[in-house]
C-alpha cells in the first residue's frame, strides 16, 4: 500500500464530506499520480466530475477505473449514467449492459437501460428492461410507470391494464399519472378519490 497516496485519498474524503469538491478532486488526482493503479481514486474523480457536469473529463477517469477494475459493475453503471445525462443513450446502454453482465441483479442498471431504450424507440427491449427492474424492486413506482408507457407505445393495452393494477396496489398517485399518460380513462375510477 502506498501510504502517501492513502493519505491523499483520506484528505479527499474529508473534503468531500466538507462539500469542497475542487479540493477533493485535487487530492484524488494527487493520490492517483502517486498510485496509478488506484481504481478507487479514478472512480472518485469521475464521480465528482460527473456531479459537476464535466462529462468529457469524467469519461476519461471512468475508462481508467474500468480498465483497472473491469469487473466492478457499479463503475460501469456510473459510466452509463453519465452517458445518459449527456443524452447519449446508445453509449449508456453499452455501459449498462456491461454492468448487468457482471451483476444481473443491479436493478438501477435495468431501469437506466430501459429509459435509454425508450429514448431510442426500442420499446420492446425497454419492456424487458423495465420488467427486470420491476421484478428486482417490486415497489419501484418509476419502473412500473415506465413499463406501462413502453407497453402503451407497443399498443399492448391488456398489459398496460395489468401494470396499472399492479402499480395501484402501492402508489395511487403514480397510477393516476400512468392512467392519464396512456389515455386509459376507463381505469380512472381506481384513483377517483385522490386529491391533488
Region roles according to the model:
Residues 3-40, 44-53:
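Alpha-helical segment of the N-proximal tetratricopeptide repeat
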Residues 17-30, 51-64, 85-98, 120-132, ...:
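Structural signature of tandem alpha-helical TPR/SEL1-like repeats
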Residues 34, 68, 102, 136, ...:
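Structural marker of alpha-solenoid helical repeat scaffolds
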Amino acid at each position: 500500500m502506498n501510504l502517501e497516496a492513502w493519505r491523499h485519498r483520506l484528505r479527499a474524503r474529508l473534503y468531500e464530506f466538507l462539500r469542497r469538491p475542487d479540493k477533493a478532486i485535487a487530492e484524488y488526482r494527487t493520490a492517483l499520480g502517486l498510485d496509478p493503479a488506484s481504481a478507487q481514486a479514478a472512480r472518485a474523480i469521475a464521480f465528482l466530475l460527473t456531479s459537476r457536469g464535466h462529462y468529457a473529463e469524467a469519461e476519461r477517469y471512468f475508462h481508467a477505473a474500468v480498465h483497472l477494475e473491469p469487473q466492478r459493475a457499479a463503475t460501469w453503471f456510473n459510466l452509463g449514467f453519465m452517458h445518459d445525462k449527456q443524452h447519449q443513450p446508445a453509449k449508456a446502454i453499452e455501459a449498462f449492459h456491461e454492468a448487468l453482465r457482471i451483476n444481473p441483479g443491479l436493478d438501477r442498471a435495468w431501469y437506466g437501460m430501459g429509459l435509454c431504450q425508450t429514448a431510442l424507440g426500442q420499446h420492446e427491449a425497454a419492456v424487458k428492461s423495465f420488467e427486470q427492474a420491476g421484478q428486482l424492486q417490486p415497489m419501484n413506482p418509476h419502473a412500473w410507470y415506465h413499463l406501462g408507457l413502453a407497453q402503451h407505445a407497443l399498443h399492448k393495452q391488456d398489459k398496460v391494464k395489468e401494470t396499472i393494477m399492479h402499480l395501484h396496489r402501492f402508489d395511487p398517485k403514480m397510477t393516476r399519472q400512468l392512467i392519464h399518460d396512456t389515455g386509459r380513462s376507463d381505469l380512472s375510477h381506481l384513483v377517483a378519490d385522490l386529491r391533488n
